């Protein structure tokens, strides 16, 4: 049961109206609420000789129902949600840097994209040590430094697993989590990241070592939260249980693939974790690497990701039988999009946002114009009635069903 401290009337009278806190307040260097240099936490002016304050444990009322609700940014229309059941508020649309920053687009275009995102209320920017072999982090860091935005006004997330070629430069060992995160911070030119993600699970590393290492980097001020990416529900639960067993810090969210053709994990597995242990979801690939845009149409344009060197796997996926079937399904969604007055891309992104437990959906764009179009999904979200969602499910024919 959560408790709060109720202060006695006598103790309250010894404090000003602006300083009526329950319990002694830490001094500038005192760990126990006393003045700098030590002390025992006596109230100001108490001298240690007056009556001792009596504290009573009283039940803390549950958080109001609206505590985890969306809020809308003034002037931008951006919606903000809690990251899982943590207190961190993130924009429901975030900006990812995979493929684009340090690779597909120029640094000038990257700056334009980041600026438009920030000015439209996006406060979540995601990257990873492996993206463009570290160039994505460098590009993001250079832009943030040049912009001079308040560090407290945005959230930076990075992911650790693939850092280099050496055996000790990848995985989730304590060594690589600490050294990898320090390398990311150096490239980002930041003192800390808001969230550090384990970029996949590591069967070669004990779970206790992973959780202890993540707790360490948080306690050292290198990160504020930690999460998982592409972990199974059982692995996330194991990490949470390990944290609770040893009084460590548990993960707050999972990064997972989620789009019209990838539904099972985010719609069936993660909501259960959200309700049980408060783990939220940050999802990626809302357009399935551009497949859900109708731009392929049986071919691979030179300007898309599938045509980039090193992404032959994506080209093969687009041209596969499954890829062609999915493209046909996208064409079936065109009438629904037209009825709502939006593009298929906006419809697909809004559809991802309506899933339970999803804190934010990461967007990957190659231009500011594309980003503005995708941000238009916020207006579509309010139009997704249960009837419209049922119509989409009927066209897709892939709605996951509960095992119960």
From Swiss-Prot:
Phylogenetic placement of the source organism: Eukaryota, Metazoa, Chordata, Craniata, Vertebrata
UniProt biased composition (Gly residues): 28-50
Any one biological process term the GO annotation gives: potassium ion transport
GO terms assigned for molecular function: aldo-keto reductase (NADPH) activity; potassium channel regulator activity; transmembrane transporter binding; voltage-gated potassium channel activity
EC number: 1.1.1.-
Function: Regulatory subunit of the voltage-gated potassium (Kv) channels composed of pore-forming and potassium-conducting alpha subunits and of regulatory beta subunit. The beta-3/KCNAB3 subunit may mediate closure of potassium channels. Increases inactivation of Kv1.5/KCNA5 alpha subunit-containing channels. May display nicotinamide adenine dinucleotide phosphate (NADPH)-dependent aldoketoreductase activity. The binding of oxidized and reduced NADP(H) cofactors may be required for the regulation of potassium channel activity.
Disulphide bridges: none
Annotated active site: 131 (proton donor/acceptor)
Protein name: Voltage-gated potassium channel subunit beta-3
Compositional bias segments (type: Polar residues): 1-14
Assembly: Forms heteromultimeric complex with alpha subunits. Interacts with KCNA5 and KCNB2.
Entry binding sites for NADP(+): 97-98, 104, 126, 199, 229-230, 255, 284, 286-289, 295, 305, 364, 366, 370, 373
């Amino acid at each position: 049961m959560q408790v709060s401290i109720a202060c006695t009337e006598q103790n309250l009278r010894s404090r000003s109206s602006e300083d009526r806190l329950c319990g002694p307040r830490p001094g500038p260097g005192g760990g126990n609420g006393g003045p700098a240099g030590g002390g025992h936490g006596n109230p100001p002016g108490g001298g240690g000789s007056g009556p001792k304050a009596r504290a009573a444990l009283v039940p803390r009322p549950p958080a109001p129902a609206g505590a985890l609700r969306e809020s809308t940014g003034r002037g931008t229309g951006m919606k903000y949600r809690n990251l899982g059941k943590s207190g961190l508020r993130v924009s429901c649309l975030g900006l990812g840097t995979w493929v684009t920053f340090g690779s597909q687009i120029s640094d000038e275009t990257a700056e334009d994209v980041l600026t438009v995102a920030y000015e439209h209320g996006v406060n979540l920017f995601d990257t990873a040590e492996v993206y463009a072999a570290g160039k994505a982090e460098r590009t993001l860091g250079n832009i943030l430094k040049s912009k001079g935005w308040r560090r407290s006004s945005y959230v930076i997330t990075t992911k650790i697993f693939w850092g280099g070629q050496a055996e000790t430069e990848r995985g989730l060992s304590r060594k690589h989590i600490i050294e990898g995160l320090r390398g990311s911070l150096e490239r980002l030119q930041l003192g800390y990241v808001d969230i550090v993600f384990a970029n996949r699970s590591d069967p070669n590393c004990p779970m206790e070592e992973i959780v202890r290492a993540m707790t360490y980097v948080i306690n050292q001020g290198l990160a504020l939260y930690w999460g998982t990416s592409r972990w199974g529900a059982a692995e996330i639960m194991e990490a949470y249980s390990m944290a609770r067993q040893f009084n460590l810090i548990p993960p707050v969210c999972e990064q997972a693939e989620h789009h019209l053709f990838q539904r099972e994990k985010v719609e069936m597995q993660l909501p259960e974790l959200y309700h049980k242990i408060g783990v939220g979801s940050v999802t990626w690939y809302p357009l399935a690497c551009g497949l859900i845009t109708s731009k392929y149409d049986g071919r691979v344009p030179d300007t898309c990701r599938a045509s980039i060197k090193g992404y032959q796997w994506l080209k093969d996926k687009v041209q596969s039988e499954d890829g062609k079937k999915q493209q046909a399904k996208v064409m079936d969604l065109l009438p629904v999009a037209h009825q709502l007055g939006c593009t298929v891309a906006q419809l697909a992104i809004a559809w991802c946002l309506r899933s339970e437990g999803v804190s934010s959906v990461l967007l990957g764009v190659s231009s500011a114009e594309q980003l503005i179009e995708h941000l238009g999904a916020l207006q579509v979200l309010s139009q997704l009635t249960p009837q419209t969602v049922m119509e989409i499910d009927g066209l897709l024919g892939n709605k996951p069903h509960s095992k119960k």
